[in-house]
Amino acid sequence: LSKRARLYTEMIASPALVHGNRARLLGYEKGVNPVALQLGGSNPAELAQCAKWGEEAGFDEINLNCGCPSPRVQSGDFGVVLMLSPQKVADCLKAMQDSVSVPVTVKHRIGVDDQTSYGFVRDFVGTVHEAGTRVFIVHARAAWLKGLSPKENRDIPPLNRELAAQLKADFPDSIFVVNGGIKTLSECQTELGRFDGVMLGREAYNNPWLLTEVDHALYGDPESTLTRDEVVEQMADYVDLVQEREPLAARTAV
């Protein structure tokens, strides 16, 4: 749908890569690059190995998720709970950076529970910055670890993109990508006036046809001539490819 937009995988827990079906977890349709592998974990050595596997699989970026608030993720000591341990995050990212040549980035929130002051997220970014990370994807909401479901955590905590913009001002040598609540390419254009990039989450799967307009609207490329019928044909081919690699029934069997 877009040749320019960077696609991020769903978060893959590092233990799943170490002990699971690595070929399936790291498999993707070639030709859709740039693609980023998003990892979840808190073991520096394990994450470094997973980052290396990701680079070998052809990923253009390795991202560490420090934004997911789900209880299951919390219990595994990764996701947004890691924002409460910034030095641990810095150690993980440093180990990942030392193992690969592609960029290593971090995705995080602007706060956790009652830790919502600018100083909290500034100190988190500062600690990670000192370890060498220079690309920050900021979901401009705090996460509430108790009382809200992951879905509610994407809506109920208020957006504060101004706080994210202050991070950009305070760390001018770094790249900041804003995420959260952006639904139109017009909003993307507005936010690109103060951020280096914009990440679409739910809108990308609620309204995927929007992606056909990205290259023209944001990069000045010629308008897409892709039709919906062509997209459906490509999707059918992809399903056939996945089925050849591993029968879909094997993934859904209980």
Task: Show which residues each predicted segment covers.
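Glycine-rich, positively charged N-terminal anion/phosphate-binding segment
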Residues: 1-60
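Conserved beta-strand positions in the central sheet of alpha/beta enzyme cores
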Residues: 7-8, 36-38, 63-65, 105, ...
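Active-site beta-loop-alpha junctions enriched in small/polar residues
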Residues: 12-14, 40-42, 67-69, 109-113, ...
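Short secondary-structure transition/capping segments
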Residues: 19-22, 74-77, 117-118, 148-151, ...
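Short, hinge-like loop/turn segments at secondary-structure boundaries
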Residues: 24-28, 80-82, 122-123, 154-155, ...
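Alpha/beta enzyme core
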Residues: 48-78, 86-176
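Alpha/beta catalytic cores of nucleotide-metabolism and tRNA/nucleoside-modifying enzymes
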Residues: 91-94, 99-101, 112-126, 131-135, ...
